[in-house]
Amino acid sequence: MAQVTMKEMLDAGVHFGHQTQRWNPKMKPYVYTARGGIHIIDLQKTVVRANKAAEFVKEIAANGGRLIFVGTKKQAIEPIQEAAAKCGQYYVTKRWLGGMMTNFETIKSSIDRLRKIDTMKEKGEFNYLTKKERAKLEKEYLRLTDFLAGIRDMKEMPSAMFVVDLPKEHIAVAEAKRLGIPVVAIADTNSDPESVDFAIPGNDDAIRSIKLFSNLVADAYLEGAKEWEGKLRTMTDKQSDVAKEAKADGKEEAPKRRGAGAKAGAKEAPKKSAGPAVVKATKSRKLVAAGTAEEVEIQAELEQGQSTDESAE
């Protein structure tokens, strides 16, 4: 299980909070003392909260959920991108665009535009543009890449969010809360720990501290993802076994139906025809039966996609 230790946190400077005059009183339960005008965070409480948050992230991944990392301050950009790449999840490190999740359809159109320009570049279509048109597209491409690179493959809402610097990312947190998306965050002494589901008391300014918790979340997600892969394999194996059993049962029943009520090797007496053979089939139907007009009632089964064919007709 992914966890952090007291030594790792001390080495990363997790215990250093903000100046005492810049604190949020709601962080009082997590403050150990104050020294030199700076609050010192109680790491015994931090380790408990951090490991609890890691368990939650693992559970999200174990159920097939996705995660988004959010950290747009200078110190957070590199650690966030590395952690997101490590576990293959989404990230935002430029600026959180208002409505990035609550108005995702609009953001999705920008993502589609980014993909379209990508395709144009791959096909060499830029070579047929004028210098001015090419420069305009390049500028648009760079702007879209800056803002959307970390979510370009996002097709639906993530199951959880990890945030660095709660006061700075308050818009992202508010959108997640509105959509019912749980939030895990590093909560420095100037933060409101009650604004998120899993607050990890700690320094959100030091790069080493940010990297420590970002990697903790990434490692926890990877552990859960392995469990999810195992569940998928088990489900696939069960479906395969069921299909094999059904196929085997079909082979056993077929000879019984053919030989029922007749001796081995005996010839069947020719049946008298009561009328011309009837075969019903349409463009959207399988050929399901053939017989005589008086003896056979045909029930056609629609192919998969029945509704599409009928509406087209």
Curated annotation (Swiss-Prot):
A Pfam family reported for this protein in Swiss-Prot or TrEMBL: Ribosomal_S2
Keywords (A to Z) from UniProt: Ribonucleoprotein, Ribosomal protein
Start-end of Basic and acidic residues biased regions: 233-256
Signal peptide: none
Segments of this protein annotated with the region Disordered: 233-293
Single Gene Ontology BP annotation: translation
GO CC terms of this entry: cytosolic small ribosomal subunit
CDD domains membership: RPS2
Top-level division of the source organism's lineage: Bacteria
PROSITE patterns: RIBOSOMAL_S2_1, RIBOSOMAL_S2_2
Gene3D superfamilies: Glucose-6-phosphate isomerase like protein, domain 1 (3.40.50.10490), Helix hairpin bin (1.10.287.610)
Gene Ontology MF, one: structural constituent of ribosome
Family listed: Belongs to the universal ribosomal protein uS2 family.
Full protein name: Small ribosomal subunit protein uS2
Native species: Bdellovibrio bacteriovorus (strain ATCC 15356 / DSM 50701 / NCIMB 9529 / HD100)
